[in-house]
Design a protein with these regions (language model features):
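S-adenosyl-L-methionine-dependent nucleic acid methyltransferase catalytic domains
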Residues: 1-247, 254-255, 261-399
Length: 399
């Protein structure tokens, strides 16, 4: 049975459910920025269910229930200390996340899991499905910011976290923390620690078979100031360029930087090749001059763009344009599984590509709709907001 792939559409719902509705090898490029870990509470509209069993009649309980009534190792994931460091601005107890007593499913916001290992596992589930729907010639571009432990974020409770430092998320029972004491104690969850969440996610994707081609530094030229006094201000984020096969579409010439040459009168003509002499390190030879421009490298300095609509973080359109210019073939389908305010979809729309978004929050879907409407000359009649799918359901990929 041939399954028609939706195009120029926003699918509203759980990202895993919507991805599993898509057929294999149907997307050319994935451009996305996932929720960052432990930084922001987006409200009850962003709550979803992860892990556990789909047919379970869930019996939800809070962390406090698990802590006071005991639930094996789940007790550890529920424990937060009442002790607080002086000088740290702790928020009120956030994230009314819950656990199912029957199947250990977890109900909460992606990015507000009680332990970073659970967050990484949830993202790994998503990107395994993305790997299935991505064409062999396709690519994944993932932006993810980092988090400091014990600061002003939602999870700034160092003492409570120290009990989790040796807990390991295991696949024996979905959603449960299985206690596995390490011979050497790992104390990486300490106050003021930069958690390296993007790197940990990237390694998890490599374990799935993804091929990491570049870690690009997105230098935010007009980055936000910070009030910290004992470290440097953050001015960049990671942008990972992944592929699923060693033969993939990539057009470097489309994003080359023009040569900055200003030859006035009396200047010698520049040769397209230049010889270099033999040294102790090199055997000598020639280096080529590409008339189309220079390789832009892996540090991209781009200015953040303001957004009138209510959304906390949005891609710069120039960043998405550069990505699609080098990685999207003519007539390609662009997917953003965490569409947010829809910047990647909007840029794809402007550039004449087909696009597909997935977004959990209805009000963000409305924002996307309004932004696309402003540029409706291309293909507005193809836009629809889909809250349900009649596409043949695909089983999740297991590796």
């Amino acid at each position: 049975m041939i399954v028609e792939v939706p195009r120029n559409t926003v699918l509203q719902g759980h990202v895993l459910d919507k991805l599993r509705d898509l057929p294999n090898d149907c997307v050319d490029v994935v451009v996305t920025s996932t929720p960052y870990y432990g930084l922001r509470d987006y409200g009850p509209d962003c709550v979803s269910v992860w892990d556990g069993k789909a047919d379970c009649e869930h019996e939800w309980v809070t962390r406090e229930y698990l802590m006071h009534n005991g639930r094996g190792d789940c007790q550890k994931s529920a424990k937060f200390s009442s002790q607080r460091d002086e000088g740290v601005n702790y928020p009120d107890e956030p994230k009314a996340d819950k656990t199912c007593l029957k199947c250990s499913a977890w109900k909460g916001q992606l990015g507000l899991e009680p332990h970073p290992s659970m967050f990484i596992e949830h993202l790994a589930q998503v990107f395994l499905e993305i790997k299935r729907v991505l064409k062999p010639s396709g690519s994944l571009w993932l932006n993810l910011g980092d988090t400091y432990f014990g600061g002003n974020g939602q999870y700034g409770r160092p003492e409570g976290w120290k009990d989790l430092e040796n807990d390991k998320l295991s696949g024996h029972a979905p959603g449960e923390f299985i206690k596995e004491r390490n011979k050497l104690r790992s104390n990486w969850l300490q106050p003021k620690q930069k958690m390296l969440i993007p790197a940990r996610v990237a390694i998890a994707l490599q374990d799935q078979g993804w091929i990491l081609r570049n870690e690009i530094v997105w230098h935010k030229v007009n980055h936000m100031p910070e009030s910290c006094r004992d470290r440097l201000t953050r001015s960049w984020e990671s942008l990972y360029f992944f592929v699923k096969d060693d033969k993939y579409y990539f057009d470097l010439n489309a994003i080359r930087n023009p040569h900055q040459t200003n030859c006035g009168s009396g200047t010698r003509k520049i040769s397209q090749t230049q010889k270099f002499s033999k040294t102790s390190c090199f055997n000598g030879g020639t280096t080529s001059y590409n008339a189309m421009g220079a390789n832009p490298g892996d540090v991209w300095a781009l200015t953040n763009e303001g957004l009138k609509e209510e959304h906390f973080a949005a891609f710069p359109q120039k960043l998405v344009k550069r990505i699609l210019s080098c990685s999207a073939p003519k007539g390609g389908l662009i997917l953003d599984p965490f569409a947010g305010a829809g910047t990647s979809l909007l840029v794809a729309h402007k550039m004449g590509f087909d696009w597909l978004g997935i977004e959990l929050v209805p009000k963000y879907c409305k924002i996307i709709e309004k932004r696309i409407e402003r540029h409706g000359k291309i293909r507005l009649d193809g836009f629809m907001l889909s809250t349900s799918s009649e596409i043949e359901r695909k089983q999740p990929c297991v590796e």
